[in-house]
Amino acid sequence: VECDGKRISHLILHNKSGLQAVPTRAVVDATGDADVAARSGCEVVKGRPEDGLMTPATLMFHVDGVDQDALRDEIYRTESNRFRELVQKLRATGEWTFPYDIFISVQLTEKGTLMINTTRLVDVDGTDGWSLSLGMMRGRREVEELFALMQRHFPGFEKARIKRVAPML
């Protein structure tokens, strides 16, 4: 970002043509993390006022090969699709080491395919490239650990496979 006083005069972009300075008349910061605003010198508030803590990042993944009948039976038996009872049992045995107490999954259109939105990565700063890289590494490990627990303990996931993992937090 290049400024002329308090006005953004150019955005510096990098693409296949290299670095380019693009003149601006008006700028809408649609980065999602206030990148342009922060680089232009605007005051940016990040995280909670009292400690700066931000919402945990998550690394979603898709699994297929889920036995939906077995999964549905377990949900009806426990009257919960969050598997709280199972998570508490696994936490008591020391197998569930994650900092959250629920399992979140969403049925997708393909039979036996679910999106898992359960990972929670605390202390990831979405505005810092290094923090995002470390968070991505932690997230991939967490996906592997969570999926192994799912296959061992969650009804319907015994023969499931990881179909895809999100490319970004």
For each predicted feature, which ranges?
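Flavin (FAD/FMN)-binding glycine-rich loop and adjacent Rossmann-like elements that form
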Residues: 1-10, 14-26, 30-169
